[in-house]
Amino acid sequence: MTLLEFFRSILRRLGMIIFPSAFKTMSVSVKSSSAEVTVVETTGSLHTLESLKDEVMRLFRSPCTLRRMLSMSSALRIQYKAKLQESEACMLPSYCHALPNGRETGTYISLDVGGSTLRIALVELHGRESQNPMVIKHIASSKIDEHTRRLPGTEFFDWMAGKITDMLDQTKEAWPPQTTLPLGLAWSFPIEQTSHRGGKVQGMGKGFACAETTLGMDLGELIEAACARRNLNVRVDAIVNDSSATLLSQAYLDPATSMALILGTGTNAAAYLPTGCMSRSKFGARDQSWFDKADRVITNTEVSMFGKSILTETRWDELLNRQHQRPDFQPLEYMTTGRYLGELLRLIIIEAVETGELFGGVMPELLREGYSLDTEVMAKLEMDTTKTMQQSIAMIKKAFGLKKAPSLKEVKFLRTATESISYRASAYMAVAVHGLWALQKDTDINPTTPNGTPKTSIACNGSVILKYPGFKDRCEGFIRQMTDTASSPAGTFTAEKIVLEPTNEAAVFGAAVAVALADAP
C-alpha cells in the first residue's frame, strides 16, 4: 500500500465513524414490464465489509422467491411470443422439422467446428433400444490456432478437408470403396440457413478471416468443394447449431426431449415448436413442400437476448451493462453465464476494496482489468465448505496475486458474494427455461407430453450447467417449484415433471442424428 492509499483508507474509516448517515445505501424503484417492480440499488456510499456482504446477499437473492420467479417467467413468455412474429435475430426456425424416433441407424462423419477446436468423428447409430445406441468409433481433435484463424477464403476449408482426410485414412475399413460419405456439421458461427444441408456464410468473428471472402457463399458447398480437391467423395447432408445438435442427440435416446439448453461461456436454447405459431416471414423462401411435411420445427431461440426490463438487476449488473461493448444485447447472458459471473464478482470486489476492509483498500493488480476474474475461482470457493477455508485462502492469494494471504473474514465475504451470484444465475436460468416450457404448452406443442411420457426432458450442455458446483440441481429445483405450484402460468400442466438431462458429446452425436433424419424417407 502506498502512503497516499494508506491515508485515504484512514480518511474513509474516520468518515464512516464521524458521519455514519452519509454512508447509508439508498434504493430507487423503477418500473418493470413484468408484474413485479424491479429494484435497482444505487449508492454513493461506503459500507463496512459486513454490511456490504449482507446487501449483496439481499440484492441477489431477493428476486428468487417463487412469486417473483413466476412473474418473470410469465413476462418472458410474452416476450418470447412477440419475437415469434417479428424478430430477425431470435426465435429462428431451422430446417429440421422432425425429431428422431430412435430407430435411425447408420455410420456417419460428424464435424464439430467451434471457436478454438475442430473435431471430426466417425459415429455409429445403433438404435435407441440397443445396449449402446450411439458410439464414437474414432474421433480426432485439432486446435484452431491464430494462424489457422487467419487463413483466407477457401484455405480454411482446405485445412478442414485435410483433417477429414487424416481421419478417414485411419478408418478406411468403415467405408466400401467409392462410397459417398455422409457428413453432418455442427457449426458454432452465424449462418443464414437455406436448407437442411446448406446455408450462407456470415461473419464469424473471433479472428476468423475466411468469412471475409466467402461471405454469402454456401457453407455446405464450400466444404464439399474442399474435400473434392483432395479426391474425397463427401456429401454434407446436415448443418446444425450447438443447441439443435444437443436437442437431437438427447431426443435420439429419450422421446420426452423437446428442448435443449446450452450454458457455458455463453447461453442458448433450442425448442421444438409448431410452425403455425410463427410468422410466415420467419421461414424465408421455403418451398410449400417443406411446409407440407413440417408441423413443427426445431427453433433456435437465441434466449440470451431476452430479459431486458424483466429480470431484476443490481447496480453491479447495470455497471457491467454500461461498460459492455454491446449494452442490452444479451441481458440473460450477462447475468447467468461463465463469461460474466466472474466479472460481477470483480465489480463487487472493487466496491468492497473501497471500504478499506478488503485487501487493505488496495485493488489486486491481477484484477484491475475487466473480465480478469475467472469463474473457475468462484467454483473453487463454493466447493470449499470447511470452517478454516485454508484451500480457498491459498487459492485466492495465488489467483489474485496478493502479497499476503487474505484473512478468513475476507474469503468468507468472497464466498458469500460468489454463492449469491451463482444462486441468482441458476434461478434466472430456471425462469428462462420455465418460460419456454410454458410457451410450448401455450402453442399446443405437447399438452400431454411427447408419446404420453410424464415428463419433459431438456438436454443440457456447457461447463456451467454441467460442472459448476450445485448449479444444475439448484436450477432444476427452481423449475420444479414453478411447475408444482397452482399459480404456474402453464395452468393445467402443473403435474408434469421437467428434467435437465446432461448430454455427452452432444455436437458430435447431434450432427450424426441430423444426417440420419435427412436420410429418412
Give the label of every model feature segment.
Residues 1-138, 147-181, 253, 317-521:
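ATP-binding/phosphotransfer module of carbohydrate and carboxylate kinases, centering on a glycine-rich
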Residues 129-136, 206-216, 247-346, 350, ...:
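Glycine-rich phosphate-binding loop of actin/hexokinase-like ATP-binding domains
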Residues 141-161, 191-251, 256-259, 275-307, ...:
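Glycine-rich phosphate-binding loop and adjoining helix at the ATP-binding site
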Residues 185-189, 241-243, 504:
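A general secondary-structure junction signal
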